[in-house]
Structures are given as C-alpha cells and as structure tokens.
Amino acid sequence: ACNLHCTGCWAAEYGHKLNLSYEDLDRIITQGKELGIYFYMYTGGEPLVRKADIIKLCEKHYDCEFHAFTNGTLVDDAFCEEMQRVGNLSLSISLEGFEEVNDLRRGVGVYDKVMAAMDKLKSHGLIFGTSICYTSKNIETVTSDEFLDMIIEKGCRFTWYFHYMPVGNDAAVDLLPTKEQREYMYHRVREIRGATGGKQIYAMDFQNDGEFVGGCIAGGRNYCHINANGDVEPCVFIH
C-alpha cells in the first residue's frame, strides 16, 4: 500500500492490494534471527502506512536493527518520539532533487512535506538519510554541491543513490542514465565521500559500488527480498 502514485515506481508493478500481516512479519524476523540475520529493511509501497506494526516489531525484536525506505510524507512528531523510544529504527527518505523536479514525479507538495519531515527528524536527534533515484534528467542536480549541502544542513547522515530502472510496459526508457552518466556517477560518488574535499555525508551507489562487496549481493549472498505476497526473491529489482 502507498499514499502516493509516483511516475515510474517499480514497486507499483506488484499491485496495491498485497500486504504481509504483522504475524507474517514477526514470523519472518523470528526465523531470520535463527539464521543469524539481525538487520531488516522495509520497502513498499510506503512502509509508514504501517507505523504501529513497525514500532511493535522494533519493540519485540529489540536485538535487531530496522531501516525503512519512505517517501517521508507520514513522518510526524509522534512517530519521531516512538523512533526515539525504541532506538532501533532509521529512515531513508526518497528525494529526486529540488522542488520542481521532485514533485514532477512524486506529486505537488511532496517536496515541502519531505523538508518538514527532515526538520522533525533532525530536531529529535534521529539518524536518517536520503534515497535518491538518479535519472538522465536529474543526475547533475542530485550530485551537485548545492543539493548535497542542503540535505546535510537538513540533518542527513547518508544518501543512497539508485539509478532509474525502467519497469513495466509504459516505462520511460529515456530516463535511464547513459553510459557516460553512469561513469560520471562512479567518480562523483567517490569525490563526495572522499577524505579530502568530500562532504560530511556518506554516499553510496547501489549499483556502482558493487566492487566493494564482490559484485551483486543478491540471491542470499548478503541479501534477499521478501515481497508483499510472501515470496522470497533474489532481489527487489528482478520482477
């Protein structure tokens, strides 16, 4: 389930009616711990439509760390206080650039809600970052000094970069970064997190940083995905 209808959303291909129950999620985490797994990520849809269940799972599985990829529009002070209380949940907030570019894909007013969410998270001293889908159109913006300085000022400690994945029959293939843009990104991310001249934020490129983990981490090497139907998949992006 999700409260937005973003253009080009890969998760929308799963449909909008499937959801794992609290009992399903609890069972997955319990079984995962038996296998030695203590780090869990929530994607969506929008995970924060299930705020109560997420906090309940954080409480029960206090020996685990949880991370949610969220559009940020449902973050409020009450939820920040709950995050503070449980202490084992962090967030990555989706952002595509500044207001005009971001709201073009995500909807009018979403950028302002994200900025407000960041202010709340920062004021509560919580750990959060951004999840950025870079395309052929926004790659220069989301790697610019101006943009990075802004999210650092807002309190972001890290940023994920994912290149646009054209999913579905109506996918906008022209948004896929070119070979030259991918090469630019490879070097730019290393500049951003460089010890000399870098930014006060940890930048990660999900695809281009594969060399640090010996290639793709999917298929149970270090990671697998369980979709909203309960199916175990090698990777969230394969469907």
Predicted regions and their residues:
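Radical SAM/AdoMet-radical enzyme domain recognition
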Residues: 25-42, 50-162
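Radical SAM enzyme [4Fe-4S]-AdoMet core and its adjacent flexible, acidic
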Residues: 103-215, 219, 228-233, 237
